[in-house]
């Protein structure tokens, strides 16, 4: 199954799981127009971040690509320092410097492997991490942070799923079907655990701690 289709099903099953919980708790699902636009902005960043990641896998080995994705704590810190005036310590500066050097070595430039494809992959993966960092930094400053975490996460992933569906339709012309029972089970678990549960708890964390701390802790799990 193509990775874009996997993402769509992942978000779809995650939304179904969250919708079931919302219906169980009889949560009011109405959205004000302003809140809809704010959620759509977050969904767009999340969807484009996901697209950049899966496209980046076409240009680099999956291990290197995943490592580059985890540049997002560095992006989160830099955005917080520049725009939110967070204090930048010497230790943090050294950590950022080491991370930048690591990305430089992973790009393959020193080995003579810095081809256009490799640089394209590097750009896509750093873009993915950057957009995820922007998502984490701006959310705590938005009015929708007062919305129940489960409801907010549902709408973010619902609109992201629609964006990915449009992307798959225009780029591939179709969404791959689920062929086997094992695929169905795996996709459901993928939607439940690393999508629904993980991102609801992320939203809850961003309401309690700084974006930088959430990004650093998130990189360890």
Give residue ranges: language-model regions.
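Transmembrane alpha-helical segments that form core, pore/gating elements
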Residues: 3, 15-18, 76-78, 114-172
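Specific alpha-helical transmembrane segments that line the substrate/conduction pathway
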Residues: 5-16, 46, 54-87, 92, ...
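Helix-helix packing/entry segments at the starts of transmembrane helices
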Residues: 8-9, 65-71, 138-161, 195-221
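Hydrophobic/small/kink-forming positions within alpha-helical transmembrane segments
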Residues: 12, 19, 43, 47-51, ...
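Specific transmembrane alpha-helical segments of multi-pass solute transporters/efflux pumps
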Residues: 25-69, 105, 190-209
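Loop-to-transmembrane alpha-helix entry segments
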Residues: 33-34, 69, 85-105, 115-122, ...
């Amino acid at each position: 199954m193509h990775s874009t289709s996997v993402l769509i099903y992942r978000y779809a099953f995650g939304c179904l799981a969250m919708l079931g919980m919302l219906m169980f708790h009889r949560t009011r699902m109405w959205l004000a127009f302003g809140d809809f636009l704010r959620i759509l902005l977050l969904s767009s960043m999340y969807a484009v971040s996901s697209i950049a990641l899966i496209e980046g896998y076409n240009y680099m080995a999956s291990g290197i690509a995943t490592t580059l994705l985890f540049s997002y704590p560095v992006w989160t810190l830099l955005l917080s320092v520049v725009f939110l005036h967070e204090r930048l310590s010497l230790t943090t500066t050294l950590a950022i410097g080491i991370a930048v050097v690591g990305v430089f070595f992973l790009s393959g430039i020193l080995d003579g492997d810095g081809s256009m494809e490799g640089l394209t992959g590097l750009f896509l993966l750093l873009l993915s991490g950057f957009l995820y960092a922007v998502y984490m930094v701006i959310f705590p400053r938005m009015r929708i942070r007062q919305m129940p975490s489960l409801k907010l996460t549902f709408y973010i992933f619902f609109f992201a799923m629609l964006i990915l569906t449009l992307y798959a339709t225009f780029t591939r012309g179709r969404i791959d079907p689920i062929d086997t029972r094992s695929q169905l089970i795996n996709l459901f678990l993928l939607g439940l655990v690393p999508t629904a549960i993980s991102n609801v708890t992320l939203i809850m964390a961003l309401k309690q701690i700084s974006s930088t701390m959430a990004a650093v802790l998130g990189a360890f799990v």
